[in-house]
Amino acid sequence: MSNTTGFTPLLTQSRVDGDSLVFNVSEDWTQGRTAFGGLQAAMALTAMRKLVPAHIPLRVLQVTFIGPVLVGDVTVQARVLRTGKSVTHAEARLISGGETGCLVVGVFGSERESSLKVDNTVYPELPSAESLKNMPLFPGITPRFLEHCALRWARGTPPFSGASEAHTGIYIRLDEPVSSEAHMVALCDIIPTPALSMLKRPAPASSLTWTLELLRNDYNETSAEPGWWLMDAEVTRGEGGYLSQTALLWDAQRRPVALSRQTVTVFA
C-alpha cells in the first residue's frame, strides 16, 4: 500500500484549533466521496476522549451520518452533555466543507454492582479464517478504505453475487492490531451490508444511522500482528430503500465483543 496513511497516525496527528480537533483525511480512507464511517466515528471518539477520563469505558456510540465528510481537513467539535454518578454523555460533530457531516453521541459508563448476568449469544460454527481467502479488491468498485482491511466470507457470499439471503459471517481485521477503543469502533464498520450480496450488479449503499454497543472492554490485541474477528450480520427487514441490520462481533476466544445496529440506505 503506497501513499497511504495508517489508522493510528491519522488519529494521533490531529491538531488543536481552539476547542476543536482537526484531522486530515486521506483518499485511502474513503468510501465513495465520503470518509469511511468507522473512521468518522473514531475521530469523534478521539475528540470526546479529550473530555472524558480514560478509566470510564465506552459503552455505546450513537452515530448519524448526515452528509459527506470529504478528503482533507475535518474539524471535530466535542462537548460533555452530562456527567452523572456512573455515566457520562458526550457529543461530537464532524464539520467538513463548512457543513455538519456526522453527529455522534458517546455514552461512557463505570461498572457497577449487579446481581444480573445474562448471555444468550451463541457462537456460529463456521469454517476457520485460515481455511478461507481474502476478498479481492476491485479498483473503482470496492471502497478505498478496504486497502487497510481484510475480509474472508465464512457464511454467505460477497456483494453483488445474487445470494438468496441477507446473512453473512465474515472474518475481518485491520492492517494493525486492535489496541484501542478507536480501533474497535473502526473494525465494527468494515463489513458491507449483507443485503448487497443479494444483488447481481453493483449498486451504492450508505449507512444512515449506527448504534454500536461494546459488550466488554478487555478486547485489545497484544500481539504485533492483527488477528481475525468474526462479524455475524443479518438484515432483519428491508423495504423502500431502507434496511435494518444487526451484527455481532466475536473475538478469537469466541467471546461476544460488540453489538452493531444500522439503518442502511440502498439505491437498487
Task: Go through the PLM ranges and name each one.
Residues M1-A268:
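Terminal targeting signals and extreme-terminal segments of soluble enzymes
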